[in-house]
Design a protein with these regions (language model features):
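Structural beta-strand/beta-sheet cores of well-ordered domains, especially the beta-sheet scaffolds
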Residues: 4, 18, 31-33, 45, ...
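Beta-rich carbohydrate-recognition and catalytic domains
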Residues: 69-72
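Rossmann-like AdoMet/SAM-dependent catalytic core
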Residues: 84, 93-97, 106, 113-115, ...
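Multi-bladed beta-propeller domains
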Residues: 11, 23-43, 74-91, 118-132
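Conserved beta-propeller blade repeats
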Residues: 1-9, 40-59, 87-104, 132
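A flexible loop/linker signature enriched in serine peptidases of the S9 family
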Residues: 2, 9-19, 38-42, 60-67, ...
Length: 132
């Protein structure tokens, strides 16, 4: 992870986080780079570091729908990549650990399930913990 930068969200006029920026420590805020912007006024955004500290995840969500993007912490010019396109009523959250990506979702699982895959580009998800 590059300790010269940090990421933050910026609030819109309704005090909702809708944009993610990257700031270089010691530089002017005027030079901050817009990394992600949520276009829907119903959705808010946040950014987090994966458990294995290899990826940043940008999550955008409303009350019952979510969508997530990712990029590697080593990327010099971060370009968030979509994990799974938003689908109304489907909530999901992806994290990475031990060489796998884990997805906690209610997609076809009212009480949620956890799936995993080893590659987000191919996304061959397998059930890790089934819904009850």
């Amino acid at each position: 992870m590059d300790d010269q930068y940090f990421f933050y969200s910026k609030l819109d006029e309704f005090h909702r986080p809708r944009k993610i920026f990257r700031h270089k420590i010691g530089s002017s805020v005027k030079n901050d780079e817009l990394i992600f912007e949520e276009k829907s006024e119903a959705f808010t955004v946040g950014i987090s570091l994966s458990s294995d500290e290899k990826y940043f995840f940008i999550t955008t969500s409303d009350h019952n729908t979510s969508e997530q993007y990712y990029f590697e912490v080593t990327e010099k010019n971060p370009k968030p990549k979509l994990i799974i396109k938003r689908n109304k009523g489907v909530i999901y959250s992806v994290n990475s650990w031990g060489g796998y990506f884990y997805c906690h979702t209610n997609d076809d699982a009212e009480d949620f399930k956890i799936e995993r895959c080893d590659d987000l580009l191919n996304q061959k998800w397998e059930i890790y913990i089934a819904a009850k």
